[in-house]
From Swiss-Prot:
GO terms for cellular component: plasma membrane. The chain crosses the membrane at residues 28-50, 232-251, 264-286, 341-360, 373-392, 431-453, 466-488, 530-552, 565-582, 586-608, 620-642, 657-679, 700-722. This is Probable arabinosyltransferase C. Residues 817-831 have a biased composition (Low complexity). It is found in: Cell membrane. Its EC number is 2.4.2.-. It comes from Mycobacterium tuberculosis (strain CDC 1551 / Oshkosh). Disulfide bonds: none annotated. Belongs to the emb family.
Length: 1094
């Protein structure tokens, strides 16, 4: 409808208006509405409290009756309770000189792990004592001689959330103890001292003695399924709610009005604007940038089927996503077909098209005649919608379904107001509740219901005269609560409450008054505050401001329907306020406004037309504000997250083409403001013409009077062209667009087919021409370059802290994401040229000489000219088109060069040319300098390195190894699709063929590899997954040693694509533990123990 219809006058149309006189035809409907509605609501509310079948898991050790280490990394870090009994004679294997290397009788973490003592339990020999250490606390200690004596019987240990206790049964405290003669025992309480468990490890071997026992109750509270009682209640609850809604519909039809079309008559027709919007959305589906959390959500969805529930895979100790996980469950089902990006995001594309259809077919006509008939309104609505959707909603996050849910909730409410019927209200409650629980940002959907309370109360009051209140309210109550059934279908009330309390305690859990952080990020020169995101939000705020201003000044925007337009404005304002209560403050949350942005754009377009805003001065001022918004938006980078940024123009700088765009737009703003001043002081008429304008002049005037439409479509064009240009400029190298288009042909493994892995860098070393291998690196000239001229610690510099990241600090207060194996160190044995530097990437010190310019104390100028190294033949160069030098230090790329020569030139001591290396990596850590072999003439047969360090600052130094030509294989070929991987959450969507490690019954699978994003991404996402947040990094760093493998991006050799790490267990022979499984029925209020929080 174009305008808001007045509710029918029921008292006139229906002579009998009392409840007592209701017709017999509606008496049954009333009874069904009351009974079914109330019972449906009760069953829905009771669903979280009904019992579930929980799968229990017990970790018992020894297994197979032997001292054999086993792996069992608990996703919740700790067991609900732990009981250990160790016969004293079991410690005999630690005594004697023959057992010097054996120190651990039993531990829950490998002793070699850096944080083993801080986090785990170790029963170990320390000098001549046997010590039980629990989370860095020596709980009980006894001399090993007494432990092996005749009086000692056993060591017992128990751990619960409130206390841990241990006792050497048979031993007493010594004469110098606080309580001489008392039992030798220790206890700690007042804190959760339960040790982290990643397995059971021992240095001993052979048969286990009788009485040795380790029993841990694994926390499997979320590994549950509904009991038959709960399943029956849920089915009955849904059926009763459906019956109540049917009864409500029957009561609605008592008004005597004919049935109205569910969809408008022109719903399926398309016009030119529709075609353009469809084309933009479909093309963006292939070439457009994705959101930062797509890999996070895809990995959760892929793992959930095997796990049995939708766990938060990367944080919060494996607690479930519920009550916000139902949308992810749909993605998990969708992933059964394919995990390729174009397939997984197909629902998002469908939501985008549906949003536009709802805006153009439902929203715009309801906003009034002026909006419905204005082409400027339609174009502005389309531009605003696309301007928000493209940068914020082209991924797997829940913002797209929330944006659609808000629109559908509003449309249902408007249909209820227009028809004076209550079934649309019930439907709005269902849609609103599903939207609310799609994600934390779903809280924005409550505005669609709140703004209609007044009209709906009037409808309820009128209809209650005939049917009473309860038959009308009960079905709505059932509709509002029925969403509890899918949300709590396999989980309990107590479990969800504890999970959400844990998330709030662990964080990030920012308060409402921290909302400024979201806007700080919006105005940073980063992907969070990119041109596209900043403009989307600023344009939305501008449209809201002008709509509110015109509504307040004139009562309503001329030509619009007052009720619907006020409600759409009210929803937007409430949504902004509701966003303050989300626990995190990221700019991608603004994606929930995509549908509202299109609706407000239509209103704003009408508000600034000549018919509504007659003053040319005011219209010109509005145009100036629009240009200023553009200028403010272009004062940022055209940046996107991770791989979406590859090849994008101005991705790391402000846009500039001969001159700065933001400066030019600011100057244009001033010119438009001067024009507004001229209209105010000189030509102060209202600009109306008496003569009939020509068709061309009318069209030109319409365009000029639509500055917001022009700006939004310019931004949409800028975004689409930028990402299309990125795909073209990158070709044949990898890009998002190329990968998605190739997926149509069946090549669905994404980046894994283009990342080239160098497993053995020693195989590609170039052979020296004349000098021995050990001396060739310094054979030409070596002044102040020495084999040990490298600091012991070359850890990469950390990035700066960013707003809101304080929740993600590691134990040292830094935000880092360094690549293990590249941070340096020293070795006990010297290498081939006497260097003790620890080399990265599996380089063999016995075959790899090292020279560096650093020295302790005062630095001196240093120069290096290596001997000549033989290049391979031209045919071999074509197969491996890259030359690499592993280097460390802080230096300018001009200070390290590669020179080439023919045999004759080298013999004469001359070179035929030189080039700089591309320095890809983080200083001063070890990294691979790259040079394309195509830049070396085909006649060249030899190369050498030249380094010049004239900077005497202690932090400025150079360390080099000999040149090599990598022998590479694709990551897909090396890692494959079978090995369990630790996929960082930024990379999940780019590697759809790799299998993320799973978890089941509270125990994680042990990964063999880890894939990280680029340096910026690794430093941003690694702290999210660490021990403090209950993520998988807190497990892998205790269980395995990570080593970075050299890798390169095909045809984009100078790109920091990310990193591949090999994960090697500290105990290579440890096998996955066998769990003792069982099933038990638990009530919805049952809790085994508090969840671990620190």
């Amino acid at each position: 409808m174009a305008t808001e219809a007045a509710p029918p006058r029921i008292a006139v149309r229906l002579p009998s208006t009392s409840v007592r006189d209701a017709g017999a035809n509606y008496r049954i409907a009333r009874y069904v509405a009351v009974v079914a509605g109330l019972l449906g609501a009760v069953l829905a509310i009771a669903t979280p409290l009904l019992p579930v079948n929980q799968t229990t898991a017990q970790l018992n050790w020894p297994q197979n009756g032997t001292f054999a280490s086993v792996e069992a990394p608990l996703i919740g870090y700790v067991a609900t309770d732990l009981n250990i009994t160790v016969p004293c004679q079991a410690a005999a294997g630690l005594a004697g000189s023959q057992n010097t290397g054996k120190t651990v009788l039993l531990s829950t973490v490998p002793k070699q792990a850096p944080k083993a003592v801080d986090r785990g339990l170790l029963l170990q020999r320390a000098n001549d004592d046997l010590v039980l250490v629990v989370r860095n606390v020596p709980l009980v200690t006894a001399p090993l001689s007494q432990v092996l004596g005749p009086t000692c019987q056993r060591l017992t240990f128990t751990a619960h959330a409130d206390r841990v206790a241990a006792e050497f049964v048979g031993l007493v405290q010594g004469p110098n103890a606080e309580h001489p003669g008392a039992p030798l025992r220790g206890e700690r309480s007042g804190y959760d001292f339960r040790p982290q468990i990643v397995g059971v490890f021992t240095d001993l071997a052979g048969p286990a003695p009788p009485g040795l026992s380790f029993s841990a109750s694994v926390d499997t509270r979320y590994s549950s399924s509904p009991t038959p009682l709960k399943m029956a209640a849920m089915i009955l609850g849904v059926a009763l709610t459906g019956a109540a809604l049917v009864a409500l519909h029957i009561l609605d039809t008592a008004d005597g009005m004919r049935h109205r079309r569910f969809l408008p008559a022109r719903w399926w027709s398309t016009g030119g604007l529709d075609t353009l919007v469809i084309a933009v959305l479909v093309w963006w589906h292939f070439v457009g940038a994705n959101t930062s959390d797509d890999g996070y959500i895809l990995t959760m969805a892929r793992v959930s089927e095997h796990a049995g529930y939708m766990a938060n895979y990367y944080r919060w100790f494996g607690t479930p996503e519920a009550p916000f996980g139902w949308y992810y469950d749909l993605l998990a089902l969708w992933a059964h077909v394919s995990t390729a990006s174009i397939w997984m995001r197909l629902p998002t594309l469908a939501m985008a098209l549906t949003c536009w259809w709802v805006i153009s077919r439902e929203v715009i006509p309801r906003l009034g005649h002026a909006v419905k008939t204005s082409r400027a309104a339609a174009w502005t609505a389309a531009g605003m919608f696309l301007a928000v959707w493209l940068p914020l909603d082209n991924g797997l996050r829940p913002e797209p379904i929330i944006a659609l849910g808000i629109l559908l909730t509003w449309c249902s409410v408007e249909r209820a107001v227009a028809t004076s019927r209550l079934l649309p209200v019930a439907i709005a409650c269902i849609i609103g509740a599903l939207t609310l629980f799609s994600g934390p940002t779903g809280i924005a959907s409550i505005g669609a219901l709140l703004v209609a309370i007044g009209p709906l109360r009037t409808i309820l009051h009128r209809r209650s005269r005939r049917f009473g209140v309860l038959p009308l309210v009960a079905p709505i109550l059932a509709a509002a609560t029925v969403t509890a059934i899918p949300i709590f279908r396999d989980q309990t009330f107590a479990g969800e409450i504890q999970a959400n309390l844990l998330k709030r305690a662990v964080g990030p859990s920012l308060k409402w008054f921290d909302e400024h952080i979201r806007y700080e990020r919006l105005f940073m020169a980063s992907p969070d505050g990119s041109i596209a995101r900043r403009f989307a939000v600023l344009a939305l705020v501008l449209a809201l401001a002008v709509s509110v201003a015109m509504s307040l000044r004139k009562g309503r925007i001329p030509g619009t329907a007052a009720g619907p337009s006020r409600r759409i404005i009210g929803i937007t304002i409430i949504s902004f306020l509701a966003m303050m209560f989300t626990p995190t403050k990221w700019t991608h949350h603004f994606g929930v406004f995509a549908g509202l942005a299109g609706s407000l754009g239509a209103l704003a377009a009408v508000a600034v037309t000549g018919a509504a805003m007659r003053s040319r001065r005011n219209r010109t001022v509005f145009a100036a504000v629009v240009v200023f918004v553009l200028a403010l938006s272009f004062a940022s980078v055209n940046g996107w997250w991770y791989v979406s940024n590859f090849g994008v123009p101005w991705s790391n700088s402000f846009p500039k083409w001969r001159w700065s765009l933001t400066t030019a737009l600011l100057e244009l703003t001033v010119l438009v403001l001067l024009l507004a001043a001229w209209f105010h002081f000189v030509a102060n008429g209202d600009g109306r013409r008496t003569a009939r304008p020509t068709r061309f002049r009318a069209r030109l005037a319409g365009i000029v009077q639509s500055p917001l439409a022009i700006a939004t479509w310019l931004l949409v064009l800028f975004e689409v062209v930028s990402l299309t240009q990125a795909m073209i400029s990158q070709y044949p190298a990898w890009s998002v667009g190329r990968s998605n288009l190739q997926a149509l042909a069946g090549k669905t493994c994404g980046l894994a087919e283009d990342v080239l892995v160098e497993l053995d860098p020693n195989a590609g070393m170039l052979a020296p021409v004349t000098a021995p291998l050990a001396d060739a690196l310094g054979a030409g000239l070596s002044e102040a370059f020495t084999p040990n001229g490298i600091p012991a610690d070359v850890t990469a510099d950390p990035v700066m802290e960013r707003p809101g990241d304080r929740s993600f600090l590691n134990d040292d207060g830094l935000i880092t994401g360094s690549e293990p194996g590249t941070e340096g160190g020293t070795t006990a044995a010297p290498g081939i040229n006497g260097s003790r530097a620890r080399l990265p990437y599996n380089l063999d010190p016995a075959r790899t000489p090292v020279l560096g310019s650093w020295r302790a104390g005062v630095q001196v100028p240093a120069m290096l000219r290596s001997g000549w190294y033989r290049l391979p033949t031209n045919e071999q160069r074509d197969r491996a088109p890259l030359l690499v030098v592993t280097a460390a230090g802080r230096f300018d790329s001009r200070e390290v060069r590669l020179q080439w020569a023919t045999d004759e030139q080298a013999a004469a001591g001359h070179h035929g040319g030189s080039m700089e290396f591309a320095d890809v990596g983080a200083a001063p850590a070890w990294r691979n300098l790259r040079a394309p072999l195509s830049a070396i003439p085909s006649t060249a047969t030899q190369v050498r390195l030249v380094a010049d360090d004239q900077d005497l600052a202690p932090q400025h130094w150079i360390a080099l190894t000999p040149p090599r030509i990598p022998r590479v294989r694709t990551l897909q070929n090396v890692v494959g699709a079978a090995d369990p991987l630790f996929l960082d959450w930024l990379v999940g969507l780019a590697f759809p063929c790799q299998r993320p490690f799973g978890h089941q019954y509270g125990v994680d699978e042990t990964p063999k590899w880890r894939i990280l994003p680029d340096r910026f991404g690794a430093e941003a996402n690694s702290p999210v997954m660490d021990h403090n947040g209950g993520g998988p990094l807190g497990i892998t760093e205790l269980l395995m040693r990570a080593t970075t493998v050299a890798s390169y991006l095909k045809d984009d050799w100078f790109r920091d694509w990310g990193a591949l790490q090999r994960l090697t267990p500290y105990y290579p022979d440890a096998q996955p533990a066998d769990l003792n499984l069982g099933t038990v029925t638990r009530s919805g209020l049952w809790s085994p123990a508090p969840l671990r929080r620190g």
